[in-house]
């Protein structure tokens, strides 16, 4: 029977590739890189260095958001959000801090520290859910 006429089989997965490997450390490493760019630029007057640092800071900020979104949309499920009612707000605040209103718009390492703090709060909840699983 041609594949087109074969019966449809419904499958589901919690992510694009159901690997089950999640860790907020990925977001944290990228946020640490953002903070390092901010700190190093403060000590350097070379315009080429600053341009490279800006590009890296933008890219790493996007990666922070990506890793947070994967956790938010693929790992955490409705029971987690019920048990931790502030979880959606934490993700919203963290992704905004990694965006145009946060690390992308600022060279202040304190903004990166706020982002790292939100990631740490998310990580604490993440590891609690892993223990319960």
Predicted features, each with a name:
Residues 67-84:
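Short, solvent-exposed, charged loop/turn and helix-capping segments
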Residues 50-68:
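Alpha-helical segments in soluble extracytoplasmic regions
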Residues 1-50, 80, 85-121, 125, ...:
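N-terminal intrinsically disordered, cationic/polar leader segments
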């Amino acid at each position: 029977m041609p594949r087109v006429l074969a019966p449809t089989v419904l499958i589901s997965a919690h992510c694009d590739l159901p690997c089950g490997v999640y860790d907020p450390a990925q977001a944290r490493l990228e946020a640490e890189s953002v903070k390092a760019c901010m700190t190093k630029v403060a000590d350097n007057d070379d315009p080429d260095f600053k341009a490279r640092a800006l590009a890296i800071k933008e890219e790493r900020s996007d990666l922070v958001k990506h890793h947070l979104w994967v956790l938010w949309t693929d790992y955490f499920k409705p029971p987690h959000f019920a048990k931790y009612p502030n979880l959606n707000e934490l993700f919203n605040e963290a992704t905004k801090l990694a965006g145009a209103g946060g690390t992308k718009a600022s060279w202040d390492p304190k903004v990166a520290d706020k982002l790292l703090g939100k990631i740490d709060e998310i990580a604490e909840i993440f590891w609690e859910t892993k223990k319960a699983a």
